[in-house]
Amino acid sequence: MESGSRPSLGQVILLGTSSMVTAVLYSIYRQKAQVAQELKGAKKIHLGEDLKGILSEAPGKCVPYAVIEGAVRSVKETLNSQFVENCKGVIQRLSLQEHKMVWNRTTHLWNDYSKIIHQRTNTVPFDLVPHEDGVAVSVRVLKPLDSVDLGLETVYEKFHPSVQSFTDAIGHYISGERPKGIQETEEMLKVGATLTGIGELVLDNNAVRLQPPKQGMQYYLSSQDFDSLLHRQESSVRLWKILVLVFGFATCATLFFILRKQYLHRQERLRQQQLQEEFLEHEAQLLSQASPEDRESLKSACVVCLSNFKSCVFLECGHVCSCRQCYLALPEPKRCPICRREITRVIPLYNS
């Protein structure tokens, strides 16, 4: 294959990048779609008096992926908020987040940057109980921190701005980092809050437990109801599907463009080869019919008009095949009629 027919480096990089991005997006889409399908297949169980009876009749006294909703109740002690009075919960998360501006040497802009510099999570055992009074049933929640959607509520949030002197400001400007301050946050799962648990529901020694599911399914302890949770997951699936289609179309369009360019170049090469064969055949026919005196003049004739003598040497290919008038009539960019290489320089040829 000639070098002109090969895809450019930019085209190869574009095709490879778009293909790789499409593959990554498709993998994420498959994972999201699988999670949504698993949520649709989860069994909804009412937190009531018949809960233990339902589990005792289930295979292995277990529902592998169940949905249950109830109110949060501590087993023994509770956690008190450090900043809000009379705020009690069963999970407490304290975070310190640093905010600063970082100079981007590529875009020459200051960009916002934040990172967690300290985080501590405290938990105490808790149950899910029915909202109705007088129902003596509860579900013990195990390993709540393994949940992918822990329904914590922000109960306190305060930003502490950085205090800088003039010399500090100059030093930060030179270093490329300008601190803005520290954000202090407290999140809690309050006692009495409504929680939707999705996981493995097990009856063990007359006690019901909700724990992380097996087989790679996701564990949820969400403040949203099940329908809202499912709708959010399906919306995420649709978004990733659109991204896959967009990048997939871009990949197919790039591949089509490269293949079309290859096809057109091949057709042009075949056409030029056919023209050259027809010319050689016609020249041989003229030579066979011409007298010996005319054969020498025909060999020196321009391959385009066959009337004038060859008077141009084309570089870089070195072919001598055209008169000056036919060379000037060639379309831009000018190419050799024999090999189709671009003509970079012309040397006049003088016939004696």
From Swiss-Prot:
Cytoplasmic side, ranges: 1-8, 260-352
GO terms for cellular component: axon; mitochondrial outer membrane; mitochondrion; neuronal cell body; peroxisome
Location in chain, cross-link Glycyl lysine isopeptide (Lys-Gly) (interchain with G-Cter in ubiquitin): 52, 299
Membrane topology classification: Multi-pass membrane protein
Matches recorded under InterPro entries: MDM2_MDM4_MUL1, MUL1-like, Znf_RING, Znf_RING/FYVE/PHD
Reactions that this protein is recorded to catalyse: S-ubiquitinyl-[E2 ubiquitin-conjugating enzyme]-L-cysteine + [acceptor protein]-L-lysine = [E2 ubiquitin-conjugating enzyme]-L-cysteine + N(6)-ubiquitinyl-[acceptor protein]-L-lysine
Mitochondrial intermembrane compartment segments: 30-238
Pathway(s) the chain acts in: Protein modification; protein ubiquitination; Protein modification; protein sumoylation
Subcellular location: Mitochondrion outer membrane; Peroxisome
Zn finger limits (RING-type): 302-340
BP-aspect Gene Ontology terms: apoptotic process; cellular response to exogenous dsRNA; mitochondrial fission; mitochondrion localization; negative regulation of chemokine (C-C motif) ligand 5 production; negative regulation of defense response to virus by host; negative regulation of innate immune response; negative regulation of mitochondrial fusion
Highest rank taxon of the organism: Eukaryota
Xref: Pfam families: GIDE, zf-C3HC4_3
Enzyme nomenclature, EC number: 2.3.2.27
Main location per the UniProt record: mitochondrion
Keywords assigned by UniProt, alphabetized: Apoptosis, Isopeptide bond, Membrane, Metal-binding, Mitochondrion, Mitochondrion outer membrane, Peroxisome, Transferase, Transmembrane, Transmembrane helix, Ubl conjugation, Ubl conjugation pathway, Zinc, Zinc-finger
TM ranges: 9-29, 239-259
UniProt free text on domains: The zinc finger domain is required for E3 ligase activity.
The protein's assembly and partners: Homooligomer. Interacts with MAP3K7/TAK1. Interacts with UBC9. Interacts with and sumoylates DNM1L. Interacts with MAVS. Interacts with TP53 (via N-terminus); the interaction leads to ubiquitination and proteasomal degradation of TP53.
Descriptive protein name: Mitochondrial ubiquitin ligase activator of NFKB 1
